[in-house]
Amino acid sequence: MDARKFSTHILDTSVGKAAANVRVTVSLLDEIQEWRSLRAAQTDADGRCLLLEPGQFPSGIYKLTFHVGAYFAERDVKTLYPAIDIIVDCSENQHYHIPLLLNPFGYSTYRGT
């Protein structure tokens, strides 16, 4: 049984809260080294988002584009980063959870559980 899933969670560290309603685009690097967009999703009220479910998530190199400019604009906050790309190698047969810790002038990410 394929248990692979791909998910994210965004926390806005400038206010100490989850970042809700942020659009996230998932792309896969194809065999000719070009990005192929797979889908767009949106974080829920808790800042969480299931990006790809089992059966939709083959091994490969993925790019997550977090469209955070609109999130900050809605709050009348200037940001240096209108979008953030995170590229991950998802070659193991396991769940991948990639959180984003966000503020208007910086960000950090890590391999979550």
What are these regions (language model features)?
Residues 14, 22, 39-42, 53:
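Short hydrophobic alpha-helix segments
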Residues 63-113:
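Feature of secretome-associated and extracellular-like proteins
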Residues 33-50:
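Short, acidic Ser/Thr/Gly-rich low-complexity loop/linker segments typical of extracellular
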Residues 57-62:
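A glycine-anchored, Pro-Gly-centered beta-turn/N-cap motif
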Residues 1-20, 28:
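Beta-strand-rich domain onsets/edges
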